[in-house]
Amino acid sequence: LLTERNVEVAIARQPEDSIAVSDANVEAWLDEYKPDLICLCGYLRLVHMKPWMAGRVLNIHPSLLPKYGGKGMYGTRVHEAVKQNNEVETGCTVHFVDSEYDHGPHVLQKSCCVAHSDTIEGIAEKVFKLECEAYPEAIRQVVEQLRV
């Protein structure tokens, strides 16, 4: 959809056989092109935020932040904590990135109920469905604001 509208898209994927995409290479590319919007997906490291990046970097997190956020809280670890603490609601948060893990201003949150009978895998499935709705919606909202 973006390429059909002449919007340039670049994707830095982590090869399955490597530990990580080179942070230095990604950082150099970002500094060169200074994109209007950077969307993180599964990026489990702290982003070295530069002044030009403020309000341009989005992340999605599998909890209703500020609950279950911070260093080391991702994926199954979040869902395990939700189950262990007998939460009745969980969800996802799309937020702007700042210099702390899972801390920046929220763009939107989507929630779902957690039944006592839900497994960790079941919770993960519910949250993933919400993430698939929330991230595109949040990106649209942010892009509309960029156009103003």
Features from the language model and the residues they span:
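One-carbon transfer enzymes
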Residues: 1-148
